UniProtKB/Swiss-Prot annotation:
It comes from Escherichia coli (strain K12). The gene is dolP. Pfam families: BON. Residues 1-18 form the signal peptide. This is Outer membrane lipoprotein DolP. The lineage of its organism: Bacteria, Pseudomonadati, Pseudomonadota, Gammaproteobacteria, Enterobacterales. Keywords: Cell outer membrane, Lipoprotein, Membrane, Palmitate, Repeat, Signal.
Length: 191
């Protein structure tokens, strides 16, 4: 049997330390997000489960699966559908499917008619979301942890638990970010 060289042992130990550090940092980040989110942990879990259930229900429809690109976001039981479909009928069917999922209290259908966007536009959307979140984070007018940001084809969608004043400020901040074509809000208002 061949023994491991001291260098192999050292490299293995360093790699394992990196894995442990990544796991600890990742767990801390998730814990911090859960702690600062205004929703209860139970509601956060319910929303995550709702997203999975809606995605699963949509993926069972062969035409939607083949012809449309739909992303699902859930917040406080409200479901936001964004993406592209070739026609209004398919978009309406996606909304009906989402409404039939247990736990979906309300469905916002923001699916646009057209061809699904490509990887380049999807990457740009991720960058826009990052810029919007950064601007919200530095704002004194909005508690950024109360706002969920989704971007699709340059359109920014905002959801969350906010005051009316925070909602206006968040929409204004998002609208000023370069690359944003439009801002749509679906907030739940708190007093």
């Amino acid at each position: 049997m061949k023994a491991l060289s001291p260098i192999a042992v050292l490299i293995s130990a360093l790699l394992l330390q990196g894995c442990v550090a990544a796991a600890v940092v990742g767990t801390a980040a998730v814990g911090t997000k859960a702690a600062t989110d205004p929703r209860s942990v139970g509601t956060q879990v319910d929303d995550g489960t709702l997203e999975v259930r809606v995605n699963s229900a949509l993926s069972k429809d062969e035409q939607i699966k083949k012809e449309a690109r739909i992303n699902v976001t859930a917040y406080q039981g409200k479901v936001l559908l964004v993406g592209q479909s070739p026609n209004a009928e398919l978009s309406a069917r996606a909304k009906q499917i989402a409404m039939g999922v247990d736990g979906a209290n309300e469905v916002y259908n923001e699916i646009r008619q057209g061809q699904p966007i490509g990887l380049g536009e999807a990457s740009n959307d991720t960058w826009i979301t990052t810029k919007v979140r950064s601007q919200l984070l530095t704002s004194d007018l909005v508690k950024s942890s109360n706002v969920k940001v989704t971007t699709e084809n340059g359109e920014v969608f905002l959801m969350g638990l906010v005051t009316e004043r925070e909602a206006k400020a968040a929409a204004d901040i998002a609208s000023r970010v370069s690359g944003v074509k439009r801002v749509t809000t679906a907030f739940t208002f708190i007093k």
